[in-house]
Each structure stands twice: as structure tokens, then as C-alpha cells.
Amino acid sequence: MPYSSQQNGYTSASTSRLSEQTSSHSRSSREDRHLTEKGRRPPSPEARHRSDRDYDRRRSTEYVRDDDYRRSSRSSHDSRYADAYDHWRSARSAYSPTPRDDRRDEARNDLSSTKRHRSPEHSTSRLRHRSPESAHRRQNGTANRLDSKPDRGGDRKTGEALDSGRSRWSQRAYEYDDWRNERPSARYERYRHDREPHRSRREDEYETKRSRDDSNGNSIYAPTRRSRSRSRSRSRSRDRYRSRDHSRERRRERSRDRSNGTYSSRDDRRPKADRSAHTIKRDEHSTRLNGTSEDSKDLRHESQRRVSASVQSASEGPASTPVARAVYIKHAEVDQEAPAPPTTRDYHSCPQRWPDQADSAVRASSAPNGSATAPSRSDRPPANGSSGRHSPRSLPTREKAEEARTSSTRRPSSQTNDNVNNSRDPLTQRKATSERSFGHVLLPHELPVECRGKNYMATATYKEGVKSIYKSAADKHLVDVDTRDPRRLGKKSSRYRESLHSASFRWDSNSRGKKPLPPPRNLVLTNLSGLLQPHQILLHILPHGRIESSKLEIDPKIGQSLGIFRVTFAHDFDEHGKPLESMPAGQNPQHGAKVAKAACLALNGRMIGQTRAQAFLDRDGEVIAERIKAKLAENEHKLRPTIVPPAPPAAASSSPATPSTTKQSMPPPQVPRGPKVFMPAAPSPSYASSPASARANTDRYEYSATSHSRYRSSYEESRKLASSETYHRRRGTEEYDTYNRSKPYADAQVPAGSRSETRKDIKRPDEEILNELRDKKRPYVHIPRPKNCDIDVTSVEAQLRSTAPIWVREGQKGFYAAFHTSKEANQCKVVNETLTIGGYTLQVDVRSAPSQHAPSQQIRTPSGKHASVPLSMPAPPKQERKAIDTGLRPPTADEKLKVDWSAAELQDAVFRMLQKELADTFVRDVKSRVVGPYLTAYLKPDGEGGKMLAKATMKKPVIPTSINDHGTTLFEATGEARLPSFRKLAGAHPKKKASDADTTTSQAKRDQTDAKKKRGHTHRSKVHRDRDVSSSENESDDMERGMVVAARRNSYTRSKSSTKRRGAAAWLLEASDAEAGTDDVDSTETDALSRSVSASVEPTGEEQIEVDVGAKAKKIPKVKAATVSKKKGTTAARKKLDVAPPEAVVEADQGSETATPETDVPIKTAAAKAKVKPAKTSAKAKSALVDPFEAGLVEDSEDCHYLRLALEHLSRTGELASEHTLPDEIELEVEAEEQAMAAGGIPKHSTGSARTEGYYRIPPEQKAMHLPDRNKATEDVDTSSNAQILQSARNNRADSRRLVLGIEQHKRETATDTDIFKFNQLRTRKKQLKFAKSPIHDWGLYAMELIPAGDMVIEYVGEVVRQQVADEREKQYERQGNFSTYLFRVDDDLVVDATHKGNIARLMNHCCTPNCNAKILTLNGEKRIVLFAKTAIRAGEELTYDYKFQSSADDEDAIPCLCGSPGCRRFL
């Protein structure tokens, strides 16, 4: 499609009704080029061209303007040159085909009307030949033709002229051939037989000349009537004589041929010479388009020669100059309205045919490549100055567009046609003509209806089924203006690199050097809010990838979030970059480093919560460590005091110093509630001072009104605690009163430096200060001063300001603060237990007034519950010993309730608690390592203590009292160490005499001993309780247990003979007492106690005897002294050796817990009294016998063993033993092993060593005997009281009856609203419990705080299943070997199974006298098992409840009970 068609468009367009494309040369699609002319084309002057029936003049405007429904047989040529009036077809005759319909299309344009007029007359002539004369061509001039008015109703020719036989050449073919020549060439070739050979002109001049020639008879052109009738109208065709069906078929065929691009030479009826002379444009033939055919080359050279000839003839023709000038001037005016770009050629550059030009002159071909074999209408440039279809279009630029606008508005000069033609070179014009390449773009008349006449064009190649996009052609120029040639762009001014890029390769096995670290896949987020939870932060991180681990960093001091979050992303690739095989199926592998990098870029600077987070990548934890360190330093800096101490402390100091942080100038706040440590409560309330260096240089007068108003209330409360005398005292002459009630801030303007310097110079000797206190009888507080420290009196006064001392003096050893009464001094101790000044912790020691007799002796006033006792009594002489003074005390109830405290207070509290624990550990270490071995060595039988005990047991009944006194002295000498209790040994007394007086004396002594024993038991229980409660760590029990083990290991070296010797001696003692007929019960109990104590110390042989003592203590009756026959003597002796009374066993266990040394002196003493003699020997004779041990008869363990065997044989048979009568050693060992197995003990090792025996099971009861954590709930129970035992038994029976009647009824009786209320309270505040090893069975549950009676302890949680399911689970557990099941029955149908799912409540053990009971509560329709405290439970006491198993001792599967309580039922 030529560029001109896109450039100017058409005012009206039409489409064909047929399938082929409509020609661009259709008269219905051309613009009205004559609208710009002064006149319109006149109608045909011939009468044969006129008709009374001209339907075009009577048609409506719509029909005239748009004839889209009409058929057109014109081919689809690409351009139409409507404005080129001087475009001549060729020198030879041209043929115009008749239109398809019976009427000829004649577009006659008018200035005021665009109607198309049609002539209904039929053409009767087959051919109309053009006139070969020049006078019939354009010699009359185009201007006259344009200026002439149309002759609408002119007179027609006479019949003579019409009937003339001469054929006449029609001048219309020459005057108005522009619209005819634009018809497609195919029409001229195919319908040559329909063309009229005679064309007539319509100008008046031509008609006048013809009439003149006719009148003169000289005209040879006058046509005959036949020819005139034959060529009456061009619009008439012989096709109307054909059948319509045949015409339609031919139309379809021609349309099909044109659409397929086929052409047949047989349709052309012209001679071969005429066909080659007349150029035909055919876009369908590629050979002609490309100019490769021989005919195209020949025609191209011929056309060039004809162009030169035509140009030469045009320049020589004088008659054509005025006409051409007029035509060019007229078209110049038209060009002013239609601008054209300068790159395109206008109509002046086209070769013209002038009237005097030869007929064979043909214009040059427009295609340089010879695509057109002959000049055609499409080769001329359009009237608007646009270039041809194949012309090379240069890129439109702004300069060219400006030049186009300038040339379009410039008036053409009035130069002659010669100058115009001479100014343009035909060869240059030919070169400027480019080949056409727009056949693939839709033509304007093929555009949609809404896009026609608007200068629109398609933006892409037309494709069937694809919607095309149309835009204005003017926009294309705007887009192309910005297009630039990238080759002409300037080079970038970039700097050259100084070095080459370093190549990076993936490290593999062939690489050298150290393997590089993997890329980081840890992401660290900082600057987060401390209130954000981890799940809130993960919401921002999870969208980036899968997370392997995450952690929110916590401040170790205060337990608050640091605002630092660490995330590790999952990595699913190995070292070689391959996905891991362990990755789940269907999961996409993730590269942790890439995900971490993307997350870091996305999260850095994002708002998370209320802050903007900062993201960092961390490879091995270095980044997060630095961030945590910086954050902790920042937090510490915020809490750092702003007031600097006056003088830094010295480097070396003998006093314990605590680094302080902050301290207010008023009474110190309470100690924060730190980790719970269960220590006995202090007898009196006390307040701890918080470490603060702020008051180091703060004078008591130098604090602002703001601080005064802040602490005024606390200050007044502390003042009210003091005596009323403080408010009315005045300054004395000899006293320096440091506080004046009337003027508390009178000296506020005095500089602190001057006052401190003044006070610093006042330093008195300690004797002078003490003499002053002695004279005034003032109790005082002594504050020792550390060495090499610079603490002045002003700082101490500021610390003691809340308690208002009379004066504060500085001595050589410390500071002294005087008070009026001891109550004020004790109050100062309560408020200020320790003082923290300048980083030093100073202890406050309350002392009474110095004594008049002993000025140097002073006594410490206790700060406990006896602190309010007046200190008027004389002070006892002070013992010179170094006591461990921790300076700490357990937190009070008020301190426990405090929750708001600063970091400095927390630091001080933690330091004091650690100091307390270290002091306790040190005391226990001294007991176990220093005192314990010393006592063990002292109480050995061959040592001093052992001999004293032996003498006291045999001869002197009063000596044990002195031994106890000596033991008391030892207890005082070793500080707070608690020695083993020897009350049982002290209660032992000699055998009864045979006389009545001795019997009476013995009875009186026995009563007195019983009373002492009860008092001693009560005292020991109290000591035991204090000791158990004060222990806050399990290490204390571990240390004591280690001490006991050490003592036992020392005793393991004793041989079996020595062990059996002691047993034989005891048996001899019992046998002699039985034969003598004694009936002393206490003596027998004492001997049994001696054996039990020895057994508890040496586990070699006697440990096996104690196995079942705890389990059968309730069923064993007391051993009564009676005369035993010889037949039953051995059996009785063995029973006494195997079984000891329960009281003795309990005492033995307690003794082993407190590192009781070996005490076999009483056994030796008893054995010494044993004598082998007849049964009826008098008491006097017995006392005269020689002791075999003292006589040297028994020297070692072997002698003792054989002596025992001999005595057993003698008692059994009544005969002396000999070699033949003694039993075999193997038989004795087997018998002893059987006895041990029957007693439940550990059997004897067959190999002689436990290491070579392998693994064997130790019964739980055997383990329980050696556990240090004895049940604290039963240790302090008084064995003498049977009321509680009976009450417990009644309760157990009542509980059993309730269980039989139904737990549901029991629930309704006990579950009240109060219980539900307590259960709701437990949800908010749970009891502090812990689990640890229990002597009853495996693990146990212990209380960590005091639980009052009736409070809810814990809920029993587990899976709620039906009874049938619980039975099956129990069997399944037994098959799996799991005998520790946790099934708790709720009612008759439901059971709670806590075996796999539950809480620590399942660890509660059974006890026959429990301290908890279970209740079933119904909350929201759901049954809950809740455990309540039955009695008050102390801290450290084990929680137990009754399992209520319905079994007895007769059952085979009865489970023995190991609770060890006085009311134990022996079986569960």
C-alpha cells in the first residue's frame, strides 16, 4: 500500500461485496479531488450520453455517497493518483471496460455536491478508438476545461451525426483519462471487447469544432449514426444480452482467479505487441515484482528510453506550455492544502506526456528493479506529495517534520513548466522511487467502518482469527521521532578497570588450600521490642522459608527479652549441592543460605511490632554474641548510678565487698523476691538493705525536696517504730547529736566536702568511745571497718539516718552508733542489717552497754525474737573463737510478697543467698571431713571415748551423764555441728541385783531413765526438724550420706570372724541372763539396741539382719526376759540376732544419717560379762568369773567365730564341742545364705566379690534402708502416742467403707463450693512442688513451701478411659514388663490413666498415714481428681496419700508397704 494512502486517507471508502479485496482505484473509495477545483467536470456533451432517466440525480445522499453494496470488478491495486492530471496512459489507444452492471459508473464531482451521476444508457459499441490526432487530445487546454461549466441539458446531436458511419475517436479518453487510467490493468486486458473505440469530448470547444467540420464537410471524424448509436454510452455493455446466470459464474471465476493471484494470457485478446507495449501492474507475479524476468528487464530499458524522449518532446512543445503551466499552478494551490514530507516526490517529478509527444512515448518505470513492465498509474506519486509504495522511507525526525511543514505552507513560484521540468533530473527521480512493500497491510478501505476516513492504519500484519489493532498514522511519526540509531550514540564515559575480575570456582576435592566456610544461614533480628513473643516474630519470618530452629535471647539477670531473635533456616543440600536423601517426599529442597539472604534483605528495616527491626546474617554465632554483649552493656549502663563515689575503694581489702549499683538516700527498699529457698523463717521481721553506691557521698542533709517528698511516708513509718524519747532529745554537752528534729535540713547549704573533711579529722581511740558508752550506759551498734578503705562518718550517718542514732563516732576498728535503749539498737539492726558504702558491705553488730567490771568484754544482742529483751543482765565471758558470720537471714513474709525490685536489689539478694549457701556447705564440709573422723576415732573401742563408754556401761551408771556433758562440750567446741544422739546409751543401766533393795533402786532409776529418754527424744526431734527445714539443697543429704559411706567403708575391713565374734558375745550375754533367771526387760532392750546400733554401723553381716525390720516392726513384740530351755536356746538367740525392736531400728537409721560412729563397746562389755557356767549359778559367782576377752582367750575374729560355734553347740546339746561334733563350714555358709534369703536380704556372693557376681536385682526395701531422704512426714511422729494411730486406722476404715459404697456418694459429701473455689484458685496460683528420690518407692513428690491443712495441692491429670479399657491396659502394661502403672479410679465407669499422659501428681507415693487425701470435683460437667492437704505440710516434706488397695497379707500378690509410718499396715 502506498504511503500516500496512509498519509492523507480518503473521505469516503467502500468495500466489495465479493470475497476479493476492493481495488484502491475504485471511484467509490477515492476522495473527491474536484472539490477543491473551481468547477466540476462537465457531463458528456453527446446526446448519446444523455438520458431522461438519470437515476443518480434522484437518488438520496446516503445512496450516492455509499455504494458499498454495489459490485466492483476492479482488482486490488495499492494506490490511486487522483490528483495527477497530467498522467497519460500511453501513446496508443486505451480501452476502458464496461462496468458489471448495465450502467456506467461516472463519478462527477461538484463543489457543492458529491453525488455520483450515472447514465442508464447502454453501450452499443464494442470498441471506442481514441483519436490519434493531437488536436483531439489536450490542445484546448486544461484550464478551459476546468473553468467550463457542465452542460447538463445541452442539445443533442442530430440524427445525421448519430447515423454517420465514420467512427470517431472520443476526446474524453484524452481529456479525462485520469480517472479512466486508474482502472486496474486486468480490466483493460480481460474486457477489451467491451471497451468503446470511440471516445468523445464533452467540452464546448470540441463540440463547436466538430459542428464546424460537419458543416464544411471536411471532418473525417464525424461518426455515422450506426457508430454513434453503437458507442452511445460507455456504461452500456454487451453483457446485458447474456444470461445472468452465466455472468455470475464468470464473475465468481474471475474473482477466484484474482484472489488466487492467477493470470491467464488467453484472457488478453490484444496483439502481443500491444500487450508488451502497455505496462500492466501485477502484484501477484513475483517475477515482475522482483524484476527477474527477461520481459521486465527489456521493458525497463525501453521505458527509460521513452522517458528521455518524452522529456525532450515536452521541452520542445510550445503549445503545451500555457496549458501545463495552468495545470501546475492549479495543482500548486492544491498542494498548499495537502502538505507532503520533503523526502517524497511530488507530481512535478513525474515524466509527463505533452500534446506534441509521440504516441509511442511512455513514461519511465517507477520500479528500479523492473517490477512494473510498463509505466502505470501507480508509479506516479500521489497528489498530496507522498511517496510511492516501494519508495524507501527514511526515519522521520523532528528536523524532517519541521521541513515538511515549512514546504507545505510555502507558495510555489510562478516558474514555467520548462524550469520545473529542467530542475529535476529523470534519472534522479527514478532512483528516488522505491519498491513497494505494503501488500500485507490492510488498505484504508479495508479498515473497519469506524476507522475509515480518520487516517488510521493497522499496527501489525493481518492474520485471520486475530484481532488487529489500529491507530492513527500521525501517532506513528511521534513514536518514530524518538527512535535513534544505537551505533551513533556516544560512548559511555566509564573508567577502565585496573585489574581483571577474579574467577571463582566451587571448592571440591581437587581444590587446594583450606575449605571455605559455608555461607551463613542464620538470621539475627535485633532492635525488637521486649514485649514481642517468639510466635509473633515468626509470623514475619515463616513466609520466607522453612525454619530449623529459633531462639529469643533473654537477659540472664532480670529474665526479660533482649529484643534479639535468632533463626536458623533448614538446608536440604549436601556439600556437593545435591538434595539430601532423607528429605521427605513431595517437599521441595530449600537452600538455607539463599533463603536467609533473601529474608535478611526483606526484613531489614521492616516494622515488627512497634520498632523497626535490623537483620544480620550470622555464620557461627559471632554476630549474635556481639549483639548480646552490646545489649547487656547498654542495659547495665542504664542502671549504672549517676553519682560517683567520693573515693574509690582500695585494691586489697580483707572485708567481703559487694559491687553496688544504686542506693537511695532514704530507708532501703525491701529485698526482691529471688529464687525460692526453703529456710526456717526468722523469729522477727527484718528488712534488708539494698546495695547502693549512690549514698556513699550523699550527706544526710543533702537531698532535694523531691527525694524527701518521695520517701517521706517510709521515713515517717520508720520513725514511728522508734521510741518516743527520740523525738524529744536535745544535744548534750558531751554528745554530738547528729540529728535534730526541729531543724532536719538546717545545714543543707553547707558544702558536703567541708563537712566530710571536718568529720574525717575526728577519730578517737576505741577505749575512749567505749568508756563514754559505759558511763552513759548506752547500747550501741558497732560497724567494723574494712582495712584500706576510705569510708567517712558522713556516709555511715547517711545510712543510719532512718533509725536516728544519738551520735556516730569513728574509732580505730570501726564505727560506733549510740542509742538510748536496746530497742532502738535492735531496730537499727532490723532496718540496716548490712550497710553497703562505696562498694563495701559492712556488718551491723548490736551490742549492749559495756560492763563496769570488764570493759573489754561485750556480748552480741540477738536480732531474733529475743531482741526486745532488755540488756541489763551482766554479759557472760566471751569465748575467744572465730564464728562463721554470714550476715544474712532468710527473706521474711513481706519480702517474699515483693515483686517490684531493681537490678541492684536483685544482685544484692542473690549475693547474700549464695553467701548463705556457701556458709552452710562449708559447715557441712567441716562436719563431715573434720569433726566426723575425729569423733569416729575418739569413740573407737580402744580409744578414750570407747573405754569411757564401756566403763560407764559395766560399772558406773553415772558416767554416761558425764559423757553426755562431755559430748555437749564437744558440741559447743565445734560450733553449730550436731553430734549423734546417745540417749539410748545414756539410758542403759547395770543389771538388777538379786536383792529387793537393788530391785527397788533399779526400778526408780528405770523410771528416771524413761523420763530422760522422753525428754531426749523430744529434744532430738526438735533439733532434727530445725535441721531438716534449714537445709535448702539436696547436697546436705548427699554430704551426710557420703560421710556415712566413708565410715562404713572403714568398717568393711573387719573380717567375718570379728563380726561373728560380736554376735557370739551378745548371744552369750543373753544366754547368761536367761540362765540366771533375770526378768529385766530394760536390760534386754538395751542389749538389743546395742546390737542394732552395731548392725547399722557395720553392714558386713548385720546389714542383712535389718532387711525386714522396717516392714515388720509393727508385728514384732517386745522381747521378754524369761528362762529359756536348752532346747530352744539357739532358736531364741537367732531370733534376737535377726530381729531388733522397731525403736532400735529407727534409732539406727537416724544414727546412720548423722554419721554415727561404731559403738561396739557396749557389746564387748556385755560379752565380757558372759560366762559359760551352769544355768543355776548365783550372781556373786558370775561376777567373779574371768572375761575371755580380757584374759586373752579371744584375740581375733577367728577365735570369736569358733567360740560362738562352741557355745551354740553347748547350748543345743549340753556337751562340749569337739572336732567331730562341730558342723562343717560349708553347711554353715549355706544355712546363713538361706536365712538371708528368707529375711529378704542380699545373698552371699558365691565368688567372694560383688564385682564378679554380675548383675542381680536388689529389693526396693533393701534400697530404702540406705536412702538418706527418710520420709520427713513420719520422722517426728511420737511413737509413744497411740491416739493418732488409732485415729488413722479409723479413718482408713471409714475411707474403705466409702469406697465400697461408691465414690460418687463420697464426692457429693465432700465436694462443696469451697472446694471448687479452691480449685479455681489453684489454676491461678499453683503450689510449689518438686519430685525427688523417695525412700518409699522410686520417685516421690515433695512440697517446697508450707501448705496449710485443707488447701488444694495438685490435680491428678491423665487420660480418662472406661473401666474395660483400663483393665486391658493394665494387662498390656504387665505383658510389657511395666509394673509401675498409674491408674486412678474416678467412679464405677471411668478411670484416669496417667501412665503415658499426666503430670507430676502421679509420683505421689502411698502411705498408711498420709498427709493428703483425694476428692472428686465436678466442674462444667467434667469430673476432676483433686488432692487436698489433710494436715499441715511443711517445706521439704513428702506428699503421700492412701492408695486404698483392697488386699491383705494373705494374698499371694500382696505388695509390701515401705512407708515406715507408725500406723503402717505392712501391705498396700
Curated annotation (Swiss-Prot):
Keyword Cell membrane (UniProt): no
Biased composition (Basic residues): 225-235, 1012-1024
Keywords: Chromatin regulator, Chromosome, Methyltransferase, Nucleus, RNA-binding, S-adenosyl-L-methionine, Transferase
InterPro entries linked to this entry: COMPASS_Set1_N-SET, Post-SET_dom, Set1-like, SET_assoc, SET_dom, SET_dom_sf
GO cellular component: chromosome; Set1C/COMPASS complex
Biological process terms in GO annotation: methylation
EC number: 2.1.1.354
Keyword set includes RNA-binding: yes
Major subcellular location class: nucleus
Positions of the Post-SET domain: 1453-1468
Record-listed S-adenosyl-L-methionine binding positions: Y1443
SET domain segment(s): 1327-1444
Location in or out of the cell: Nucleus; Chromosome
Motif (RxxxRR motif): 1293-1298
Stretch forming the signal peptide: none
Pfam name, any one: SET
Catalysed reaction equations from the record: L-lysyl(4)-[histone H3] + 3 S-adenosyl-L-methionine = N(6),N(6),N(6)-trimethyl-L-lysyl(4)-[histone H3] + 3 S-adenosyl-L-homocysteine + 3 H(+); N(6)-methyl-L-lysyl(4)-[histone H3] + S-adenosyl-L-methionine = N(6),N(6)-dimethyl-L-lysyl(4)-[histone H3] + S-adenosyl-L-homocysteine + H(+); N(6),N(6)-dimethyl-L-lysyl(4)-[histone H3] + S-adenosyl-L-methionine = N(6),N(6),N(6)-trimethyl-L-lysyl(4)-[histone H3] + S-adenosyl-L-homocysteine + H(+)
Composition bias type Low complexity, residue spans: 12-26, 406-416, 650-662, 680-694
UniProt remark on domains: The RxxxRR motif forms an adapter helix that bridges the nucleosome and ubiquitin.
Subunit-structure text: Component of the Set1C/COMPASS complex.
General function of this protein: Catalytic component of the COMPASS (Set1C) complex that specifically mono-, di- and trimethylates histone H3 to form H3K4me1/2/3. Binds RNAs which might negatively affect its histone methyltransferase activity. COMPASS recognizes ubiquitinated H2B on one face of the nucleosome which stimulates the methylation of H3 on the opposing face.
Protein name: Histone-lysine N-methyltransferase, H3 lysine-4 specific
